[in-house]
């Protein structure tokens, strides 16, 4: 029996959310002990979380840059405490904010992060050059720090390598 923490930004009706919920039930059916940490949301917000052990980091996403930054620090410390209390064998995360927090949290657990989007396309909306450059540097640093990056397609993997300089040996499709 292994303990898992599955980390995601929020639970709505997207593909990453569906994968997380299916994986949670798969783990539980196979005798493992899974937990879910949702960065933003609240109990009862999604029908998908019925009969799922969920911890919520905050009730909503902040839009103000300063408040958003403070919220990220609070989420990090909340996840760090949950990891210390549960002592998971594996932490599996979905989506960028969750991936960053998972990579940063200190633990001996195996960390697996997943990338579901072509990030260079996703971040074209960032118009300020310095902000885009910092975002690209953070993505490169983050995914090079983790040797268990799961890309949902070859296109996503190729984008991480070409656009962000992530080492190919860190990425599995």
Across the structure, where does each feature detected by a protein language model lie?
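Membrane-proximal helix-turn-helix segments that form the acceptor-binding/catalytic region
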Residues: 77-81, 130-149, 165
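Proline-aspartate-enriched helix->loop->beta-strand connector
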Residues: 83, 87-89
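Active-site proximal beta-strand in glycosyltransferases
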Residues: 90-92, 106-123, 150
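A short, charged, and often flexible helix/loop element on the N-terminal side
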Residues: 53-78, 124-131
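Short His-centered aromatic/hydrophobic patch
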Residues: 75, 93-99, 115
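Extreme N-terminal starter segment of soluble prokaryotic enzymes
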Residues: 1-5
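N-terminal strand-loop element at the rim of the active site
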Residues: 6-14, 18-67, 156, 164-172
